[in-house]
Amino acid sequence: MSDPLHVELGRRYRFAASHRLHSAQLSEMENARIYGKCNNPYGHGHNYTVEVRFSGAIDPDTGMITSLADLDSFVNERVIEAFDHRSLQDEVPAFREAVPTTENLCIEIFQRLRSFPRATLEAVRIEETSNNSFEYAGKHEGMLP
């Protein structure tokens, strides 16, 4: 019998959240210089698009690597419910210390999704704006800075 075929699955999800880019390690002037308008004391919002990529063997009975319903449920529970319409630095424990940059958001979402039991998480890509996107593929394990 031959090895099962492996396929990558990409799926997109959306949520809205606000954040303020501000580092306690920097002075007010440094924060303003580095983060610009993203350092607004009142924060600002984004409509994020998150693409997750999983890989796995095609199940011979279903012809799929995983059930999309199972994947959607997992992502909704671990990501959408946790981040949608939230102030990241005020309501998400991971960002009480770490600056809620989209780079750090990629890592946090990757960590929340890597335990999906039916496929292997390959990468998380986040579109913050039409000009800015970030991707994390889990190559460098560790916690948020």
Language-model regions, residue ranges each:
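Charge-rich, low-complexity N-terminal segments
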Residues: 1-145
